[in-house]
């Protein structure tokens, strides 16, 4: 996930330089920040234990969802042409699916851990 997001950022950086000035310093800057914050959240999550990862994965999901909307606005205002929008939105959608899968796996593992801790066998041991 991190490697793909990094390649999206490098692609975005080239497009960012060519945005109209009116959007470069508003929407463009916000999109840039969202990408950096997503990379940061995923990097942090990758170094944490399973129990600690989920909040950071969820932050990354929110950032990526917001990023999709901001890119759509740039495209709808004709500040980003079709080719550039497609080049960015496809991989970003894929990142969103990957993060959703990661979040689902973490949820399942955390639920299994919680169920084991609350199982009747554990209660009998006490």
Enumerate the language-model features and the residues they cover:
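Amphipathic alpha-helical assembly/interaction segments
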Residues: 1-126
């Amino acid at each position: 996930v991190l490697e793909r997001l990094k390649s999206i950022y490098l692609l975005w950086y080239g497009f960012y330089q060519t945005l109209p000035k009116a959007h470069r310093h508003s929407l463009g800057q916000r999109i840039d920040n969202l990408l950096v914050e997503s990379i940061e959240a995923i990097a942090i999550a990758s170094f944490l234990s399973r129990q600690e990862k989920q909040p950071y994965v969820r932050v990354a999901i929110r950032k990526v969802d917001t990023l999709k909307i901001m890119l759509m606005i740039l495209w709808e205002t004709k500040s980003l042409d079709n080719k550039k929008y497609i080049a960015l939105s496809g991989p970003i959608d894929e990142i969103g699916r990957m993060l959703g899968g990661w979040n689902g796996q973490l949820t399942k593992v955390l639920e299994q851990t919680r169920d084991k801790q609350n199982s009747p066998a554990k209660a009998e041991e006490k």
